[in-house]
Amino acid sequence: MTENSNDFSQLRPGLWDTVNERYPDSMITRDELVPLVRPVKTLSESRVTFVSTAGVQPRGTLPFDTVHPVGDYTFRRVPSGSKPADLEIHQLKYPTAGAKRDLNVIFPTERLQELTADGIIAGLSENFISFIGYNMDAERLERTLAEDIADAVEAEKPDVVLLAPA
């Protein structure tokens, strides 16, 4: 899709065909398109929230269950005003050394705060959302965790949601 394109009908035509071919035994298949919505506000007028699979959470909160064989189907709210020193990573499924040196690499709280201070974005939601991406039960992921996260994001009332895998 080009900058001047008026085709906002779907993110990637044929996406679900590719997913369904790659994972033929998956319990979840899709054939409908993924609709896109034309933004109604500029970024400088938009409230932004962030959702990540990095397993980042406020220090002192219940750690994610990183050793359960099918994963952890919970999420954590992370105050958007957090500093990296206020946060920790509970994740065993990817190397975290780089992220521990600079958490903004995977959970950019300070960069988003700077964009707000510079007026690039209007503001941040009260909380960001974090969970661990290692979840082996696709049906449970979709029917519980994804629904819970969607409800939590909706409650933050953002205009824009940034989604980032770890």
Question: Model-found features: residue ranges?
Answer:
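Metallocofactor- and cofactor-centric catalytic cores in central/energy metabolism, strongly enriched
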Residues: M1-A166
